[in-house]
Amino acid sequence: MIARGKSSVEFSKVFLRSSAAISGPKEKKGPLGEFFDYSYDDPYCRTENWEQAEIQLQKDAMQLALKKIGLEFTDIRVVVGGDLNNQLAITNYALRDFDVPYLGVYSACSTCTQSIALASMLVDSGYGENILTITSSHNSTSERQFRYPTEYGGQKPNSMTSTATGAGAAIISNIPSAIKITRATIGKIVDPNLSDTQDMGRTMAPAAAMTLKQHLEDFQIELDEYDLMAYSKLRIDF
């Protein structure tokens, strides 16, 4: 592992060994529905409340990622990840029965990629052979607390995007596999001074652009270095 430029790191032997994605019923109907490993037909995920449903989503994703390569939680050095609830309550409850070390990440939309970046650093530093990452959200837990708190009293327009119900897990390892993780760039806080609380896309876009710019500078590469650049945003363009 070598530090590059101001904000980046280059890995020597880090791989995505396994992954799993579990979704709710609405997500199954979307354009990515066929790619989920499993989708519930009930937003309660056969539990009694929204929080228990999200806990179940996390457990399913983690256990399936492990099952795909024949591992158990005892084979995992540490779990890195989080959710959108206060004090990362969902992830803490999901992991409490598995007796595994845990590093919490509370980073909104970047929780998934930040967890993978941190796990990659831990693997390449020699801390562990297999590190599990987990990220989740549930429309009915996050929207009432994280994005539209009940006490805030805000009205959500029909044109707004909807927080996903689902969980994704990945096992980052130094054991070679088909997908190698080679680079990571840590972003900075960029405040565009926008006041429209309904437009999260334009609020996030400047930080994404600056991170991409820094990535290219740190590694002294051009855009054509990559076949595809994917960016997720909280906005729908018409």
How would you name each of these model-derived features?
Residues 32-35, 91-101, 123-125, 146-155:
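A glycine- and small-aliphatic-rich helix-loop capping segment at beta-alpha/alpha-beta transitions
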Residues 1-51, 148-214, 218:
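Condensing-enzyme catalytic core mediating Claisen C-C bond formation in acyl metabolism
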Residues 5-10, 72, 94-97, 111, ...:
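Solvent-exposed alpha-helices and their adjacent loops that cap or buttress functional pockets
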Residues 54-70, 118, 203-218:
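Short, well-ordered amphipathic alpha-helical segments that serve as non-catalytic structural scaffolds
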Residues 205-233, 237:
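Oxyanion-binding "anion nests"
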Residues 106-133, 172:
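Active-site-proximal alpha-helical scaffold in enzymes
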Residues 16, 50-108, 225-238:
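Conserved beta-ketoacyl condensing-enzyme motif
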Residues 17, 81-82, 131-137:
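Short beta-strand segments
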